[in-house]
Amino acid sequence: MGVHLEVLDTGEQLMVPVDVLEEENKGTLWKFLLSGAMAGAVSRTGTAPLDRARVYMQVYSSKSNFRNLLSGLRSLVQEGGVRSLWRGNGINVLKIAPEYAIKFSVCEQSKNFFYGVHSSQLFQERVVAGSLAVAVSQTLINPMEVLKTRLTLRFTGQYKGLLDCARQILERDGTRALYRGYLPNMLGIIPYACTDLAVYELLQCLWQKLGRDMKDPSGLVSLSSVTLSTTCGQMASYPLTLVRTRMQAQDTVEGSNPTMQGVFKRILSQQGWPGLYRGMTPTLLKVLPAGGISYLVYEAMKKTLGVQVLSR
């Protein structure tokens, strides 16, 4: 299985690694990370308008101008112009490098631990390794997630930039505000990882039955497998993702100190169960283009850097 799946970026921060580097590739780790960071930067920038629309639909679900994707995008352009569709993208790109580096490192340590017990890695061990990698990375970059949400939601002139946004949050709410939404974020990892990896494994089995060589899969096979498994993972964990975003943005909306239980109750009382899936349309729409852009840029970067991926 090619290592390119490790860093295929669909713009979803909970995305778990599906494979790890072989021993022969250890010396070129920085090339994989650089390729992945560049691929993620291009794909996230390309789909940033959909991501900003998603956040607005999640947070301002009661406003009529954000009831659907097109009206939401129109409202954003009217408020701040076309360039405003990329608000929050800078820090979203900035956090890619540490995010990937942490996931790689934790996954490698987990692989070494499990391989010390027996020679092959079981499905449940892959879930544990993937979940742990995401949990550690999200714990360390959660402050950047909060800043990204606030910058994405800002209106024209609210913040002078990233540092000004961080300063205002710290002055008003203290350091604890930088970990708003942490609990639902952690809880969302388990359903995401289990669903993502289960669907991915199922697709690998189906491709093998169809006669595909999974030791050296084609780009279409790799992209379709990761895209579908990621989409299923997002749907499984989406209510928790929505609650996390609402908690991170709560001061922007109501000026209160939100709790996970309180946000859940408010959504259910005001919008019912469908309210837990507000913003799902732009989320699903950006998975395929984000994955496709990421894959193409990643392969191009590997060629540029002279990386040879060894099959198992």
Swiss-Prot record:
Species, as recorded: Mus musculus (Mouse)
Residue intervals passing through the bilayer: 33-50, 88-107, 131-144, 182-200, 219-243, 279-298
Name the UniProt record assigns to this protein: Calcium-independent mitochondrial carrier protein SCaMC-3L
GO cellular component terms, semicolon-separated: mitochondrial inner membrane; mitochondrion
Gene Ontology BP, a term: ADP transport
Protein keywords: Membrane, Mitochondrion, Mitochondrion inner membrane, Repeat, Transmembrane, Transmembrane helix, Transport
Repeat (Solcar) residue spans along the chain: 27-113, 121-206, 217-304
Claim: rRNA-binding is one of the keywords in the record: no
Higher taxonomy: Eukaryota, Metazoa, Chordata, Craniata, Vertebrata
Main location: mitochondrion
PROSITE patterns: SOLCAR (PS50920)
Keyword Cytoplasm: no
